[in-house]
């Protein structure tokens, strides 16, 4: 029986994780949940999974949740302290880190320091603090399993092989909803256009990142730290069918790939049960029903966000942290109708141009740079810092 703390339980990954838990009550128990503001869904999750502890964003939400729960319920905490308490819950064997954005960094770091194994769905943890986090993982002797479908595919394709035999990692990308759109049309993209992903069902922020291809950029940076491999050995191929989730090419010319229907339950379950596997309810892949699998090189001129991620890795040190912070601000501005879709990458690049990369030695320093990046991007976009 593996005991889980799920950070971000009401988001897309959190909901899928709990679907797997519900399907295998003999294998998993939920001891802690954290959520943002979706109290109705959180209440249902509490009633179904009976966690000992839950944490929400602020005190007002905590009080409201307390009123919604009739009878004896879990301990209800709030804020960063509450998230950390959930991430370090004494009974938890594994923490599913699925909080969206840089907000997931502090509780994930706390979980590692508390000796918890991590199922990592939060890209930004490694993007903003990759070196620090991987050093912590080694120092505390914990396991970190990727939940991203692409990194899970790479992880699976590396099993039984030596890293020194790897020629390159090939991350696949669907290309998003605008893969075939001409450059001049991208400035006219609406929020509803961008939220209509052709293959995957995801949360709003990651769906916009997928449309801009910044999502793939974040994954390139994440892969660099997860697999301790230089950026020049990480390639990206556009694969519109999203059947091959990523590949590893070896020095002898062999390529290992992981295939499957696009459904996040599969990589989540693998992270929860590694090295074993469990039934997930994912639709079987019928190869005979496929009309074909196609691959293309990314067009950096139409999707400059991906190129910015490679630049951030090349600049190194604190630059990925700034890039990520600016992206979160710019995506929020687009979702709120303040800027055009094409202005997302422009805002990120301008913010990066203002930054002088420097070494980050602590999580606190990462948070300071993250704040600087957000404020600079807001300033450049003319958004009130508050």
UniProtKB/Swiss-Prot annotation:
Pathway given in the UniProt record: Isoprenoid biosynthesis; isopentenyl diphosphate biosynthesis via DXP pathway; isopentenyl diphosphate from 1-deoxy-D-xylulose 5-phosphate: step 1/6
Pfam families linked: DXP_redisom_C (PF08436), DXP_reductoisom (PF02670), DXPR_C (PF13288)
Keyword Coiled coil: no
Membrane-crossing segments per the record: none
Annotated GO biological process: isopentenyl diphosphate biosynthetic process, methylerythritol 4-phosphate pathway involved in terpenoid biosynthetic process
Binding-site residues, 1-deoxy-D-xylulose 5-phosphate: 123, 149-150, 174, 197, 210, 215-216, 219
Function: Catalyzes the NADPH-dependent rearrangement and reduction of 1-deoxy-D-xylulose-5-phosphate (DXP) to 2-C-methyl-D-erythritol 4-phosphate (MEP).
Protein family according to the UniProt entry: Belongs to the DXR family.
Record protein name field: 1-deoxy-D-xylulose 5-phosphate reductoisomerase
Annotated organism of origin: Geotalea uraniireducens (strain Rf4)
């Amino acid at each position: 029986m593996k005991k889980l703390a799920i950070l971000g339980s009401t988001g897309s990954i959190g909901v899928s994780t709990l679907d797997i838990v519900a399907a295998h009550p003999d294998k998993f128990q939920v001891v802690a949940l954290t959520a943002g503001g979706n109290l109705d869904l959180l209440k249902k999750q509490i009633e179904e999974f009976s966690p000992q502890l839950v944490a929400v964003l602020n005190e007002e939400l905590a009080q409201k949740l307390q009123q919604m729960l009739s009878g004896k319920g879990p301990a209800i905490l709030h804020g960063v302290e509450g998230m950390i308490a959930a991430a370090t819950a004494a009974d938890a064997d594994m923490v599913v880190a699925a909080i969206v954005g840089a907000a997931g960094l502090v509780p994930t770091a706390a979980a590692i320091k508390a000796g918890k194994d991590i199922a990592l769905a939060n890209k930004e943890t490694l993007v903003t603090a990759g070196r620090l986090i991987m050093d912590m993982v080694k120092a505390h002797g914990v396991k970190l399993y990727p939940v991203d479908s692409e990194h899970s595919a790479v992880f699976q394709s590396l099993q039984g092989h030596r890293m020194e035999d790897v020629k390159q990692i090939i991350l696949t990308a669907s290309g998003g909803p605008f893969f075939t759109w001409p450059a001049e049309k991208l400035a006219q993209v609406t929020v509803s256009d961008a939220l209509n992903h052709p293959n995957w069902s995801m949360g709003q922020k990651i769906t916009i990142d997928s449309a801009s291809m910044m999502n793939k950029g974040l994954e390139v940076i994440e892969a660099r730290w997860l697999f301790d491999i230089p950026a020049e050995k990480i390639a990206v191929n556009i694969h519109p069918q999203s059947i091959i989730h990523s590949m590893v090419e070896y020095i002898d010319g062999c390529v290992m790939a992981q295939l499957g229907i696009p459904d996040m339950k599969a990589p989540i379950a693998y992270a929860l049960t590694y090295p074993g596997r469990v039934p997930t309810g994912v639709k079987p892949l019928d190869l005979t029903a496929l009309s074909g699998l196609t691959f293309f090189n990314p067009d950096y001129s139409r999707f400059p966000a991906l190129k910015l991620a490679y630049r951030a890795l090349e600049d190194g040190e604190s630059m990925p942290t700034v890039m990520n912070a600016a992206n979160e601000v710019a995506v929020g501005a687009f979702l709120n109708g303040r800027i055009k879709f094409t202005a997302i990458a422009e805002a990120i690049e301008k913010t990066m141009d203002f930054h002088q990369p420097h070494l980050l030695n602590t999580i606190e320093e990462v948070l300071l740079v993250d704040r600087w990046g957000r404020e600079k991007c807001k300033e450049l976009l003319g958004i009130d810092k508050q």
